[in-house]
Every structure is written in C-alpha cells, then in structure tokens.
C-alpha cells in the first residue's frame, strides 16, 4: 500500500470502476444523498468484473451525456450525506468537481498501486513509460 492511510486497492479499484455510474446520477437526478443507500459500493470477485462494470457505466454515461441539453448544465445539483450538504451548485460544477475531478484523482491513485506492484500502467494520453519499453 502506498501509505497506511491510503484506500485499500480493492476498494479503490471498485470505486474507479463505479465512478461512471456516479456521473450518470449527476446528469440524470437533481441530487444524491449517500445516506439513502442509492449508490452502494460495488462488490466484485475479479478484475474482469471491474472492467465490465466500468465499461457498462461508461456506455451509460455516454448516453446520458448525449441526452443532456445545454439548459440542464445550469440546473442546480446537490450532494449530501444523511441530510448534510456536501456540495451544492450547478449540474456542470457537480459533474466537473464531484465526478470528473474525483475520477482523475482516483485513477492516478490506482496508477500508483499498479506501479508499486510492478504492473504495467496503461496509457492515458499517449504511451505510458511501460508501453515505450
């Protein structure tokens, strides 16, 4: 583990795999309260299940993006936990801050785990150092 306070690899991988589903929620609902149990942690038994969950979520997210009109981006969106507001702003800012920034952050953490376990890090914007060898 990168640090004792770091999220365990299995939990981190499940979170990254499930984040596209969270993006869909931001685009298709006015709010999400984690305390209501509508977004529960992904249970998995293999890396294949994680990839499948990510791919399915990414396809749903692509469809949701295509169905989101310009006016919807300005609509209010709220994230909470048992009634406590964690974020409140436009759907655009919710999507950017709560979904995109979150995905980038945890994807980078996952890359650190891969590197520390001598697993090739896949390309993001071009060939990774592992792919260039």
What does each model-found stretch correspond to?
Residues 67-83:
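Acidic catalytic patch
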Residues 56-71, 91-93, 128-133:
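Short flexible/disordered coil segments
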Residues 25, 30-69:
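Helix-adjacent hinge/juxtasegments
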Residues 22, 60, 71-74, 120:
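A general structural signal for well-ordered secondary-structure junctions
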Residues 1-39, 80-133:
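Short, contiguous alpha-helical
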């Amino acid at each position: 583990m990168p640090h004792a306070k770091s999220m365990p690899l299995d939990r981190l991988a499940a979170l990254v795999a499930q984040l596209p589903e969270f993006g869909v929620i931001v685009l298709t609902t006015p709010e999400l309260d984690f305390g209501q149990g509508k977004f529960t942690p992904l249970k998995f038994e293999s890396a294949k299940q994680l990839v499948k969950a990510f791919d399915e979520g990414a396809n749903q997210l692509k469809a949701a993006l295509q169905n989101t009109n310009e006016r919807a981006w300005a609509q209010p969106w709220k994230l909470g936990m048992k009634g406590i507001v964690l974020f409140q702003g436009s759907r655009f800012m919710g999507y950017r801050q709560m979904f995109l920034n979150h995905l980038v952050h945890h994807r980078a953490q996952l890359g650190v785990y891969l590197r520390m376990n001598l697993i090739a890090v896949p390309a993001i914007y071009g060939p990774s150092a592992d792919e260039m060898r």
